[in-house]
Amino acid sequence: MNRNDRLIYFAIFIVVLAQLVICNYLFLGPLATLTLLPVAVLFIPLKHKSAAAMLLAFLMGLLVDWLSDGVLGLNAAALVPVAFARDFLIRLFVGEDTVVRMDPVTVNKPGWFRMIAMISVAILLFLLVYVPLDSAGERSLGFNAARIGISYAVSLLAGIALSAGVTDIVTYCI
């Protein structure tokens, strides 16, 4: 494992800890769910293929569910589709050459517009699974749609800040 991968794993560990703090101590109301985990899944090193990335995402989600006051398996179930789509999203928004060379996913190569688009799709995919599973048929479609929209906006802002931080770690600590 090279130094670059260790830095990325450390950043993912910090994101999981931050998500635990958010889940346990920061309540934004019934309409907002702040999640950082889809962005962490995008930063899993590309040497891990889809199956390994899905397993890592599942374990991250299960750890957050287990150590927070959430439903066990909820984050895990919502993160697995994000990990499944990770390679496709990186190929689509960052480029095939990044996947072939197994470079770290940072803002430096694709630019902010493509990075925000990739993070946006990952967060939306996560929320489209998470919110219906969390409501379990108890909430109306309108409430769930509002929750997805508000959670998307909040999580996207946090995800952009997080990707800037990971880019700084990878770029300046090497």
What are these regions (language model features)?
Residues M1-I174:
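Terminal, non-globular segments
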